Amino acid sequence: MEYRPNDSITRAEITVIVARIQGQTGAVAQADTVFTDVPSTYWASGYIASATNQGIINGYGDGTFGPDDKVLYEDVIKMLMETLGYKPYAQNNGGYPTGYILAAQRQSVLKNVVGGAEGTEATRGQVAQMTYNAIDTPLMERYVYGGEAQYVIWDGESWSPRKTLMNQALGINKLKGVVTENEVTALDAAVQIDTDATQQIKLYVEDNYLGSNDTNSDYEVDSVYPFYTGDTNAADYLGYDVVLYAQDNKNETDTILSITEATGKNSKVEFTLDKFNSYDADTNNLSYMKNDTDKSATKLKLQTTSNRVNYSDSPAIIYNGIAYSGTLESLFGSYEGDESGLIYKDSAYSGKVTVLDNDDTSGYDVIFVDVAVGAVVDELSSRGVLTFKNSVD
């Protein structure tokens, strides 16, 4: 199915979207509506009836709804902000459409929405971006305290926890943290590989996006939790600071729906093995030559304070995808000219070194060394043992 972001969208289709982000994931039964042009047999009649009863949608005032009409930009905004509970705010700030547009702007529902103006048809791309923003927007709800009713925006600030359609209606947890383990290795040690198990990662949680006043989170900050990788490439983010969205599987391990690098984190430097220069144990600097014409090496400061992820005062080292159990000195040597490290043997092969700073605070936190050895098979024994030419082990 094609996305077609520049195509328009109908009033019935946006009504279904509004229902879905409220957690109505299954088919909604067809139902009678108050509109003369939406019979109970219409494919979206149940969604339209439900949204009408919630006060989210209105007709044209003549008894019709126009389900197949193209929806206007400001009508999408109104429906989304009504769904989020901002009707009182909008009515106190000019009503339709001004108050709803103001509410959407204040709550960043229009962030990254390209184009769009009152009186124009909304595009699928605009609706997708607004919906994406809306599900992670704090809900506004009527709250009674001390017998007095007031409206509260559940933004996680002050005394209130953070409530959104994402975590309240859709059962999706948003988390930020460092991937500390995949199905092959942790940052500090290899793991037992179970080929029959569902692939998992582990995440050191830095932020659960619920605010400091939430006491019911499944994920506590500064703790490590497992996640099924689902259809994502989450295992590739070992050592990286990420933001992930995971489907709440109730009392089971949650499944990742999406994962990306965290904004403003994960500074990294890559160089090929032949560009490696030295490691200085006294200064804890790793150096390499950026170019063949450089007269001096570029120095990279490695972390020297206790790491919140692997509880070590030196970087985690991942060698060909597996945690390296040796020291920095055993891998790189300990001073310029010291060629005792394993890296000097590997520099004869092709490969690269990636040095990652996942927190941008105290030096580089993770070192990835990837070595590829080219070899020609000389013999395959009856027992399945390979012998290579050129003395390759």
Positions of predicted regions on the chain:
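Feature responds to low-complexity, polar/acidic, surface-exposed segments characteristic
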Residues: 1-45, 54-74, 80-121, 135-199, ...
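Extracellular, beta-strand-rich glycan-interacting domains
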Residues: 126, 131-135
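Short, flexible, surface-exposed loop segments at domain boundaries
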Residues: 129, 139-393
